[in-house]
């Protein structure tokens, strides 16, 4: 049953169903939302339309010849099936008992209510030669695809009786059977390419037939199943198996791309108590697994898969800590090096090996605080990464549902405290009390034995994402060089949005992958390009520490809110404040107004001078306060209103209060009070500002205009001259600026005009005579008025 009605929930279900699910099964999965008895008819209609939009955006409805309708994932989104594989939909735990009697090799397509003729088609689709990077866990029961003989096939925990709370309760298989299975398992890819296929890697067949001895350390392999792998299927477990296999000097082609640092970490560090008898004590060298213990480890892993299935598909929708982060992910060849999610480990399970920590690729000193973590309740499991992908054409859905938050539209909103926290970019932790939150994806400091809430931040995912440990004894991330990375360094990219939420950052492991824009916000900062930064780390503009991300050393990038966060350092050496946070430099202009400042601006704008003076005498400094929108001060507002008495009262009150008024203060548009008085034609205020307060008349505003250029036609010449208008006629003269000319000057000008005469030419004389002749002879040809009228008609 779906936990929420969202785009990610639909994608998650379709991906788990292999991209194809019956219409009835899809409606049944979301029945709690579409047919909620507590919802009103309007809510039902709204949810129905929302659900239709979600389906139409990523899938299409196809009808088989027998009349069964299927919802099929669109072709452009088929690459999302890389994680879940092409397996058929698995039944939720409620329907699991119905499939309990299925044969071990029965196809995943055999679901309740599906016609028998559909099963061969599903079997053919399952055997298509496509890689399944993380879907092998879902196909563990399909023996033919994994290279295991049918005698050694294991029942899928979710399909058999292992649903709900007691998954995977089966008798152990004899050691001889497991050894025979390993010896007979020869993958075609191992012969042709030198390494096994994904299925073999994920079923502990990553070694060639002649190299069965190079197996993981027993304690390491035994404690791996104790970890839940939320939303990542088997990729993390496969990575651990690879890291364990590297502990032996024997060359293993299947894991040749693993980082050298992992070899050192796996061979030199101590191992914690194991789950089986005879664990290697701390400080001992790793020992090899026997085939029986290897098979038991495999059974434990399948139990964890069952727990993972139950956690991802609860019967009752539960609230999540945080909506999943959406990120487009392209899986490289070495994506098995994937950080695990220890947050969902069962309370009664052993803590994971520090040398194979979920974030670790570098040596780490175990910390005693890890034992206290084992008692903590398991955190909420989030869904598969690929079903949380950020598809660019789905951004509208997500943004509309998120209402300005940076969480996914699928998840319930965080608590207010968590949504306002800033980013902590932490490169690993040896302190096992500091957990990686599966919802937030970052380790945070453990307080009082319980994992603290992680801020929404980096989610270290597959595809070469490396979250690296800070070595013990380091007082800061910059003080201890780390080992070079075996593949390209993760790049940092940001998507900045103007918001009041805290900023966060993400790491991208390749040029094709970027972590989504819609998740990170920077407080009141302009948006930037989505292109990954080619310069490595681009710290936030508010970070004072010089932090960089290089090939040989990885440091922290801190984006902060208005308070301080402390990033921790290993081995209990205390926390080092690596994040110099924003000071009070933003307070003056960016924080909201208090009640008094707001009332001051409102009363000034409305011209309520009595209330203005009351507020002024309560706090005279308000006279210097600028409106955050227009940049107007009290002088600007009074000049705009043109109240001469109010201006006089303000000037006298400021003198009494000892406040120096700046009469030339400029607004957001560059206006001085004199500009506003000229624009609105308040001549009395202009005189007072210029003559008494010595306001400057040659100050230009943002348009390059001086106050006199705003004067209108009804302005007196005195004001024109007072504001320094150019000599001569003004633009809109009403009467001359200078006194009237003397009578002698007027008489002289008349005489000059009279003396200027024009002599007529002979042509003009002839023309005048010709016109007279035409007028005299115009009507002579018409002898009577009647003829003249007829001609005119």
Swiss-Prot record:
Query: Which residues in this protein are found as Phosphoserine?
Result: 106, 271, 761
Basic and acidic residues bias: where? Answer: 220-244
Q: Where is the composition biased (Basic residues)?
A: 521-533
Q: Where are the ANK repeats?
A: 630-659, 669-699
Give me the ranges of the annotated region Disordered.
83-185, 219-290, 337-360, 396-543
Q: Where is the composition biased (Low complexity)?
A: 96-108, 134-144, 175-185, 246-273, 407-417, 498-508
Its keywords, alphabetically, are: ANK repeat, Phosphoprotein, Repeat
Q: Where is the composition biased (Acidic residues)?
A: 396-406
Q: Which family does it belong to?
A: Belongs to the SOWAH family.
Q: What is this protein called?
A: Ankyrin repeat domain-containing protein SOWAHB
Q: Which organism is it from?
A: Homo sapiens
Name of the gene: SOWAHB
